[in-house]
Amino acid sequence: MASVAASSSISFAASFLKIKAFPLSPRFFPIRTLRCSVSSSSSEPIEFDISFAPPKPKPSSTHGGVTPQQLFIPWIVRSDDGTLKLQSQPPARLIHNLAIDATTQNPKKKDKSKKKQPQATSSSSATTTASSPASHSEVKPKLSKAARRFYNENFKEQPQRLSKVLAAAGVASRRTSEELIFDGKVTVNGILCNTPQTRVDPSRDIIYVNGNRIPKKLPPKVYFALNKPKGYICSSGEKEIKSAISLFDEYLSSWDKRNPGTPKPRLFTVGRLDVATTGLIVVTNDGDFAQKLSHPSSSLPKEYITTVVGDIHKRHLMAISEGTMVEGVHCVPDSVELMPKQHDIPRARLRIVVHEGRNHEVRELVKNAGLEVHSLKRVRIGGFRLPSDLGLGKHVELKQSELKALGWKN
């Protein structure tokens, strides 16, 4: 009987659905109670109700109360053939571009998120520490002009002309260094070099001049103003006469204490003053500076104070201003002036300014006028004047502003 009832109920449910003929629709209505009737040929009809229990509640979403309908974002994507289609995931190329933008444009936000995360193990902290220098190395620091100049002067060494390296090392002036190269007295890495234009690096190349090796690190450039006394020459050829460079012996002897590990500069005078002339002479180890200052094209005015024997008349001043022949060239002074008399100086004095600076030029001008020179002193070169408190045989290091007054632009 139970089997008959079950089969009858099933057939009844099927016939019930067929009778109702529910249309296919996306909307379904819940049925709470169903009235059923079962009958057979041997018994009377039996009616009963079928109740449906309500569905169990679905578990809450793990996205903080957000329903799946809210999480679904439709994407309309155009395919390769040009048709539009609807998909639930964003295109792959969009995800790739967003990842690149987040990495390149927002590095600070990325770093903040990393800082919030606690370090789990020592290995992770080591990884973070090791990766931080790489991120800093990608950004090049901006250096000021002063910092770049300091680096170029003290650390950066680029190949230079061989003649310029010799002049910077204090071997000789640029022109004299070129003559040494042409004469075959310079070797580079054991090979004789006859071209001054050869590019060398003193820190890497082995350079010899007359059997003496040029140090790898060039000495710093120094500049001095010397008040040369009488009896000193500006060259080193005559051993029986003292050289003006010997006045720097004390300075050079204490060089190693003041500059440990730095080679001593080889000093030489810029231009010359004869043995009987006193006053301003520039001493340096910079060959470029010496060539610029002593070259005739610089046309730097040089002022001399000369004391003469006897009285000076107008005709003497006229004769000096007209000039005279010196070394085959007619030299004319820039100015000639009779200085006022002083009680402590009985002799007459002249202020003479020249710009050519030829050998014995001022003495020849005074001699040509019929006067005898008693003493001669140079007091000015260009815009730099010999300090009044600088005693004979003493020297003072020149400042950058004083070098500019001498016409030097480094």
From Swiss-Prot:
Q: Which cysteines are joined by disulfide bonds?
A: none
Top-level EC class: isomerase
Positions of the catalytic residues: D274
Q: What residues does the transit peptide encompass?
A: 1-35
Q: Which residues form a coiled coil?
A: none
* E.C. no: 5.4.99.-
Tissue-by-tissue expression:
Highly expressed in young seedlings. Expressed in roots, rosette leaves, cauline leaves, stems and flowers.
Q: What SMART domains would the database entry show?
A: S4
- Residue segments, region Disordered: 96-143
Report what the protein is called.
Putative ribosomal large subunit pseudouridine synthase SVR1, chloroplastic
- Give the taxonomic lineage as stored in the record: Eukaryota, Viridiplantae, Streptophyta, Embryophyta, Tracheophyta
